[in-house]
């Protein structure tokens, strides 16, 4: 059962929401334009606001549902964590798109909303605050990722816990996926939310 949960979580994460929306609404391949990501931000820049919101909600749902399925069928915290990271892996490296997907932010949010809604909402709050102040989605995502393990530590009250370790892994993964954005931020070349790439 555990293997089935993990495999299903990966397939759920692999659902190429942004790619399908881009193809259906504008006949474009998001992997070849803008940032090359199939996530909500690239959808926003190249397809539109409402399609981007739809993609964001679905991508959050992928992480949340994967963990909730694991919680329903098992009481093992480790399986919940693996299910969540499997959904994130599917989102980043979707089998249907030859491994070229999103940057794990929305699906990661969904995962942590399921594991600890307080930590998930705190991270979302940081994202929104930084976005409001700077208009940089990438900086907002990176800021939320950096603070995620800190929020998880305060929630748990200890370091030695699978939730803390996975929050650290996801944070590092999100930062790594934004490495080109970090270079552009340093050079002053990163696009703001109201700018085209």
Swiss-Prot record:
List keywords of the entry alphabetically: Cell inner membrane, Cell membrane, Lipid biosynthesis, Lipid metabolism, Membrane, Phospholipid biosynthesis, Phospholipid metabolism, Transferase, Transmembrane, Transmembrane helix
- EC supergroup of this enzyme: transferase
Gene Ontology MF term list: acyl-phosphate glycerol-3-phosphate acyltransferase activity
Q: Which GO terms describe its biological process?
A: phospholipid biosynthetic process
Chain segments annotated as transmembrane? 1-21, 50-70, 77-97, 111-131, 136-156, 157-177
Q: Where does this one sit in the cell?
A: Cell inner membrane
Can you state which reaction this protein catalyses? an acyl phosphate + sn-glycerol 3-phosphate = a 1-acyl-sn-glycero-3-phosphate + phosphate
Predominant location of this chain? membrane
What is the superkingdom listed in this entry's lineage?
Answer: Bacteria
The record ties this protein, via Pfam families, to: G3P_acyltransf (PF02660)
Q: What is its EC number?
A: 2.3.1.275
Q: How does it sit in the membrane?
A: Multi-pass membrane protein
The terms describing its cellular component in GO are: plasma membrane
Q: Which InterPro entries match?
A: G3P_acylTferase_PlsY
This protein's pathway reads:
Lipid metabolism; phospholipid metabolism
* HAMAP family noted in UniProt: PlsY
Q: Write out the similarity annotation.
A: Belongs to the PlsY family.
Q: Its quaternary structure?
A: Probably interacts with PlsX.
Its biological purpose is as follows: Catalyzes the transfer of an acyl group from acyl-phosphate (acyl-PO(4)) to glycerol-3-phosphate (G3P) to form lysophosphatidic acid (LPA). This enzyme utilizes acyl-phosphate as fatty acyl donor, but not acyl-CoA or acyl-ACP.
Q: What is this protein called?
A: Glycerol-3-phosphate acyltransferase
- Upper classification of the organism: Bacteria, Bacillati, Cyanobacteriota, Cyanophyceae, Synechococcales
**What gene makes this protein?**
plsY
